[in-house]
């Protein structure tokens, strides 16, 4: 009986240690895309688009995406 109790205690201790090292789950907010309101013309420079979206429009990031009929600067904001 004592051996059974020590095995149960050992399993419980292992469970506690495992739970302590478990990484917390991070939930990322969804991002919604919107055409840049400050970009003019065809977008050919991802870095410039990203910087403009972040600095001028307060977006989290931006990139040049193909939207028929040309590439546009698209900014990404939290939904």
Curated annotation (Swiss-Prot):
Q: Name one Pfam family in it.
A: Gamma-thionin
Bilayer-crossing residues are none
Tell where it localizes: Secreted
Q: Which superkingdom?
A: Eukaryota
Q: What PROSITE patterns is this protein classified in?
A: GAMMA_THIONIN (PS00940)
Keywords assigned by UniProt, alphabetized: Antimicrobial, Disulfide bond, Fungicide, Plant defense, Secreted, Signal
Show which residues constitute the signal peptide. Answer: 1-29
Q: Name one GO cellular component term.
A: extracellular region
Q: Which GO terms describe its biological process?
A: defense response to fungus; killing of cells of another organism
Q: Which cysteines does the record link by disulfide bonds?
A: 32-79, 43-64, 49-73, 53-75
Write out the similarity annotation: Belongs to the DEFL family.
Q: What does this protein do?
A: Possesses antifungal activity sensitive to inorganic cations.
The name on file for this protein is: Defensin-like protein 3
- This chain's source organism reads Raphanus sativus (Radish)
